[in-house]
Amino acid sequence: MAEPLAPGLTRIWDVSEVICDVDTDFQNLVIGRTHQGVSLFSDGERQSTEFSQLVYHEALLVPALLLAGEVEQVLVIGSGEGVVSQQAVSAGATHVDHVDIDREAVRLCAQYLPYGYTEDELRRAEKGSGPITMHYRDGWEFVDRCATSYDIVVIDLPDERTEAVQHNRLYHTDFLRRCRDIGRVVVAQAGCPTLWRNESLHLSWQRFRETFPTVVYFGSDEHEWAFLSGLAEACEDPVARMSARLPTLPYRSLTIDADTLIASTVPPKSLRALDSR
């Protein structure tokens, strides 16, 4: 499996077994065995692996949980594996709306991935018979028509593309504003901080700074991705708030501790330089 990373740079995955290879209405989905365990690919790009998915999903959600404080209502857009929805419930959420446009992909993940939803859990979510309700809808449409207020809105999508694809608009400022209007904290996978692959992160940083009075960066120290949380209210010292709440967080993180919060919330110098222009 050849995964393009940047112009002139490709990562090769040795896939010892192809478990499924399906063209859904929205993407080519491959689930296979790699050296990192069962792994998920969308249109040739790695989305998650059995080995590293917990690091990724905790880096996405835990900072937002800490910023929000008490969490009851959560909206998840994308993140078809279901891990984030499960974590939100473990953190005390009484209701999670999970929105994903690709029904077939979500069901294949539940069928074949050893993490995230089981098939039974997904069936219950599809019926809305537990704390998680699954909605197979376009994320933009769902948010545009939403009358519910959420403690956290999670945006976890395939990377923004240079070519025109459906999900690109869910990265843009208009969509962030809509999410801000219904969520106290909005968090998104924002790109990669490495110098040769950081265009998406720079764009995300500018969009979040235009949209939210408080923006918190979290760069995973054991993964390649960075995440941005935007607060609908001004907060003078968000990292202190996060650190104070960590010991009492109902969800017990295995990959983030107090030292991680301090180290991982310093944005790269190139991002900080954007603010001084």
Regions found by a protein language model. Give the residues of each.
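The AdoMet/dcAdoMet-binding core of the Class I SAM-like
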Residues: 1-2, 50-187, 191-205, 209-211, ...
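Soluble small-group transferase modules, centered on the S-adenosyl donor enzyme superfamily
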Residues: 1-39, 47, 212-277
